[in-house]
UniProtKB/Swiss-Prot annotation:
Belongs to the neurotoxin 01 (U2-agtx) family. Disulfide bonds join 44-58, 52-68. The lineage of its organism: Eukaryota, Metazoa, Ecdysozoa, Arthropoda, Chelicerata. This is U2-agatoxin-Ao1q. Insect active toxin causing rapid but reversible paralysis in crickets. No activity shown in mammals. Does not show effect on mammalian voltage-gated calcium channels. The keyword Iron-sulfur does not apply. Transmembrane segments: none annotated. GO terms for cellular component: extracellular region. Expressed by the venom gland.
Amino acid sequence: MRSIISLLLISAMVFSMIAAVPEEEGLQLSEDERGGCLPHNRFCNALSGPRCFSGLRCKELSIWDSRCLG
């Protein structure tokens, strides 16, 4: 009986912590978990390697220079 009550309390605590995370922050975490997204004006590779954050694109400025830009 105690184990059932403990399990319910732990489940309620986990659910309340998940609900407390703002939606945008949750999206940012999932982008980071996908494989290291890059912020604005960082070097990137359009074909492989780390991707830019959502809303940014890897733009080729020259043959050797590509950056995450909006």
